[in-house]
A protein has these predicted regions:
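A short, structured surface patch at a secondary-structure boundary
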Residues: 77-130
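Basic- and aromatic-lined ligand-binding clefts that recognize polyanionic substrates
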Residues: 70-71, 76-80, 192-253, 261
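Structured C-terminal subdomain patch of bacterial secreted/periplasmic proteins
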Residues: 284-372
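C-terminal motif of bacterial Sec signal peptides marking the signal peptidase cleavage site
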Residues: 21-24
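Extracytoplasmic substrate-binding proteins
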Residues: 151-154, 159-228, 333, 340-372
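Proline-aspartate-enriched helix->loop->beta-strand connector
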Residues: 131-143, 160, 271, 276-281
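Bacterial signal peptide processing site
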Residues: 26-29
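Bacterial N-terminal signal peptides that target proteins for export
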Residues: 2-12
Length: 372
């Protein structure tokens, strides 16, 4: 009975986690200049080996070489791992795991956990990090994003702090990783991550060229059940940059041409105006708990997350007359993914995961559009 309750709680937490990811995306468009603070490094009085790092919430002086680094979001975890570094502590959008340490990250941190080789201290959530655990950990550097902005001044008293905004904007992760790399003395690794990204985009463009030649127009949506929340991915976004780089023409509305927001809310009645799309990818998220997550291998862990998070959108799409009237639906070219995987990581590793699934959708003869 206790195990069942723990699984249900875990599922509820996952649903709320997705909400935080989406809200974090929407909040990233807010102006934050009024929150800027200049923070001195607490680690060294010497200025001989200091550098000033400009980030989206201020200017931070960092001296010496940070050894113990904590990250407060999936995005910054992606960037840290891409620099071939490991976290001493991690704060998720919301706790899926409530013990003091992530003892088995592959089963406790979605998508990125397989690459975490440490046992990071569980710092709670990015929007409300555990100041007690942070203080006890004594990090040399704290890295987070807009979700932690309300704690910026407090975090800066614990350790030099870098916070980033607009993670879903085109080109943003490349900017962020270079500045983080400067703070950590990993400039070469940052450039390598960017170079590898560009090579991967170019290789995928060649690999998918026959598919894109036949079906060039792609529509990407985010939704839970099509009724209250549905958004269209703007070409000027992290995903737009990937998909257009591969060769797709991203479908949008003419009225949204000058809208700079990466994700733009629309209504279900708007979908017929987007019917020129040859292919549709629906990023689903589930705000209500459904089937329980299963324990086991990480592959199964991530598969259960995908099934749970995409199922409401998938079911709603099948039952909705407007959605079914679209050409892509009639031709069985609608694919279901998760918002978490496609637009919650926003970094080099996240890009690899997007491209990996895109290949599965478009190249696998055995792909069943009913399975994420």
């Amino acid at each position: 009975m206790l195990i069942i309750k723990q699984k249900v709680v875990r599922l509820i937490n996952l649903s709320i986690l997705t909400t935080f990811l989406i809200c974090g995306c929407n909040n990233s468009n807010n102006q934050v200049s009024e929150n800027k603070i200049t923070t001195p490094s607490l680690q060294s009085n010497s200025t001989a080996n200091c550098r000033k790092i400009k980030h989206d919430f201020g200017l931070t002086k960092i001296c010496s070489q940070p050894q113990k680094v904590v990250v407060l979001s999936p995005h910054t975890l992606d960037l840290l791992l891409s620099l071939d570094l490991q976290p001493a502590g991690y704060a998720a959008p919301i706790n899926l795991y409530r013990e003091e340490k992530y003892n088995n990250p592959a089963q406790q941190i979605p998508y990125l956990g397989t690459q975490v080789t440490t046992k990071p201290i569980n710092l709670g959530t990015g929007s409300k990090p555990s100041l007690e655990r942070l203080t006890a950990l004594k990090p040399d550097l704290i890295i987070g994003d807009a979700g932690s902005r309300n704690y910026y001044s407090v975090l800066s008293k614990i350790a030099p702090t870098l916070l980033w905004n607009n993670r879903t904007k085109a080109g943003k992760w490349q900017e962020n990783i270079q500045k983080i790399a400067k703070a950590l003395g990993r400039e070469q690794q940052a450039q390598q991550a960017i170079d590898n990204y560009e090579k991967q985009i170019a290789a995928t463009r060649v690999e998918l060229a026959p598919v894109i030649a036949t079906h060039p127009k792609l529509l990407v949506l985010g939704t839970d059940n099509l009724q209250k929340n549905i958004s269209i991915v703007n070409p000027n976004s992290y995903l737009g940059e990937i998909l257009q780089g591969i060769g797709f023409k991203l479908v949008s509305l003419p009225s949204l041409k000058n809208d700079s927001k990466p994700l733009i809310p629309i209504s279900i009645e708007t979908l017929p105006k987007l019917n020129q799309a040859d292919t549709i990818i629906v990023m689903g998220y589930n705000l209500n708990f459904g089937k329980e997550l299963q324990s086991g291998a990480n592959k199964q862990f991530n598969r259960d997350i995908e099934n749970n998070q995409s199922q409401p959108a998938k079911n709603a799409w099948k039952k909705n007359a407007i959605a079914q009237s679209l050409s892509a639906s009639k031709e069985n070219r609608v694919y279901f993914a998760t918002y978490y995987r496609w637009n919650g990581l926003n970094g080099p590793i996240g890009t690899e995961l997007v491209i990996e699934q895109l290949r599965e959708f478009l190249l696998s003869k055995d792909t069943n559009n009913d399975t994420p």
